[in-house]
């Protein structure tokens, strides 16, 4: 059995976006230190009062550079919003950077279709 955390990179009332990113990265680094196996990243668009996580693959690359063991999963990457070749190249690159720790989860999203740009 594996244990992990689901992270949305929540915004904070009291701080800047940079502070919210720093806090989230610190939580993930702590999760690795505590022995958790995986961090799952959401993809959340058009909701800046809730989450900063609009680019989970970019964040996954940053996590890969900051950690050594914890697996990094997308839960979920919204396929209709990305070009297939670009997604394939980015995921392959992050998997190499992370030493094979990327778990690429895809889905349709919970976005209202009217809100998709």
Segments (PLM) and residue ranges:
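N-terminal beta1-alpha1-beta2 module of alpha/beta enzyme domains
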Residues: 1-66, 70-71
């Amino acid at each position: 059995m594996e244990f992990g955390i689901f992270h949305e990179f929540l915004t904070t009332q009291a701080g800047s976006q940079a502070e919210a990113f720093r806090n989230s990265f610190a939580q993930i680094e702590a999760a690795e230190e505590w022995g958790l196996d995986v961090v799952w990243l959401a993809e959340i668009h058009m909701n800046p009062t809730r989450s900063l996580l609009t680019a989970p693959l970019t964040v996954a690359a940053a996590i890969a550079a900051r950690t050594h063991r914890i697996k990094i999963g997308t839960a979920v990457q919204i396929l209709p919003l990305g070009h297939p070749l670009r997604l394939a190249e980015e995921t392959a690159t992050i998997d190499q950077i992370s030493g094979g720790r990327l778990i690429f989860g895809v889905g349709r999203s919970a976005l209202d279709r009217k809100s998709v740009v």
